[in-house]
Amino acid sequence: MNNNPELTAIDVLLTPDEIIVKKALEINKQLMEEYPNGFKLDESHIPHISILQNYVRTKDLEKVYKAVEKVITSENITSLQLKAVKLICNGSIDEQGVAVIVISPVEILLNFQSKLIDILKPFMENNGTAAAYVTSEDDPNINDSTLEYIENFIPDHSGSNFIPHITVGIKGMESLEKLVNEPFTPIIFSPVSIGVYQLGNNGTASRVLKEWTISRTSQRILENIKKSYIK
């Protein structure tokens, strides 16, 4: 018996539509201009709403996809409408504040997360290492805060502790505080796809493993969104 199975760090997530993606890209561009060492939202750092992050056995990924698909069919995600309500500083990375757009939690999201946790438990493992993540020449290491965050995602970020959000970049704490205090007009939007992604450093959704578009219209929207990353 293998007591140290190969693991993959995954993120089951929602890809939002172009309305909120446009806002996320605008904020990210501003943050990058003021802090070039931050991360740019692109196809390797997509704007998304994380529902569940955890380690699963790599050999069970196909079973994970089937389990996620089963939950998708049981929830009315196709009619889901969400509201982005504010921009906040949500923790820090290397002494820089993390800027996120907060989404109002709704019952469907909470149910979706709860069912995902239950159905994926047989495939989950603890004590994941950097080998479970996507790395690159530009970002070759996985920091300890990422490893800790994913390890503790379920107790710290599920149920009553779940704060749906879209991470849009990082910036110095003092200047970010000024940005989050600016007026934020609420935005109504919908998800266009549900995906299982492999995580990169700092919880970025780096590599799509499996994706389900919500409708034919959503497929076209998703394609247009991905084109917008390279503009």
Task: Mark where each language-model region is.
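Basic, often amphipathic N-terminal segments
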Residues: 1-92, 106-195, 201-231
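Acidic/polar active-site rim loop that often engages polyanionic ligands
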Residues: 93-97
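A short, structured beta-strand-centered segment in the mid-to-C-terminal lobe
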Residues: 101-102
